[in-house]
């Protein structure tokens, strides 16, 4: 039984063979000699930059620029430390997956806890992505008020730009093809485009900010938080979950490492991706807050529904919204990849790897089933977002901080230093505190929503 567990450990996440050796490309044709450094960086950066980027300018409004930017940078360093813990104990325990590390430290129970956390977190994230894409392209009804989508604004109301049809076409033409790749490296080009689209949003925001600065002038941004009473003090902590979850990418690190031409370069890959993402985060937060000031909404994308007061403002609004929707479409398959592997690990713990040719039927069935569940959840279960706000917050901090810290504190191989254990304790305290705030904030917002008096 122990041998069986060891075999399955290598399958839990990204079970591609060690790619220093040439292997046939699973997706048809050619030899695969390992992923490039740049492709690995783009895939990891795309895993990091998701929907949360739009909430960062609002954190600057609450914290002020100096503490806000400082915390964004500090969280990048803390994420690097948590990933380094996993990679180091992977090498020590001769494991090639996050699940393998958890299995090595906590046995089968630890591995299953990780798989369930990734299942809950990633299904929730992907459903939210699909909901956001539907909101941007097809519009939504909220509190009895209809918010027109981009397609409706361009072409008027028609059967083909209604929400369900738009998401069905997006699923069949974008999500289905991109989720059919067996190697994450096959997504390197779409990941590069995804990062470029995030930069497009940043460039447009920066450009508008500079134009407004020289034409109308901008208010002086708040450098430090404005704490006037106990309520404003507690409000500072509401941004903690956004910042803590900003860099969660741990479930794809081993998959990317296993496919690298030189797996020993995974640490530079991680640090390059974190440096790139933290730069995008800081610049987006800075320019977004400078542009909208105290009018910055919790989701800055909503600010681009208003008149910007500059020439071609409506065109720029549409460019921002479309680039964001397209960005999420290309993030989708990168987040879907570890979800499929971990679902397979839960349901078929002793089956051959999904990358093998004998697993084609299982691969296709799991892929189709997951896409169907995500599509149905985004379209036909209105309250599903509320549910995943609670479960997703808990699962994400477990994946990013609690599990890596627990591996260090368990220290099965007696390799952790006192400094490692101190950092691990700080991670757990931060994660638990962040999760408690997130659950309280979500519960309070949900209570307010259900007590809202809808207009007649």
From Swiss-Prot:
Subcellular location: Membrane
Signal peptide: none
Membrane topology listed for this record: Multi-pass membrane protein
Protein name: Amino acid transporter AVT6B
Pfam families xref list: Aa_trans
Family, similarity comment: Belongs to the amino acid/polyamine transporter 2 family. Amino acid/auxin permease (AAAP) (TC 2.A.18.6) subfamily.
Keyword Transport: yes
Keyword Transmembrane listed: yes
GO cellular component, one term: organelle membrane
Membrane-spanning segments: 37-57, 58-78, 118-138, 164-184, 191-211, 236-256, 273-293, 328-348, 365-385, 388-408, 423-443
Keyword terms of this UniProt record: Amino-acid transport, Membrane, Transmembrane, Transmembrane helix, Transport
InterPro entries xrefs: AA_transpt_TM
Top-level lineage group: Eukaryota
Taxonomic lineage: Eukaryota, Viridiplantae, Streptophyta, Embryophyta, Tracheophyta
Originating species: Arabidopsis thaliana
GO terms classed as biological process: amino acid transport
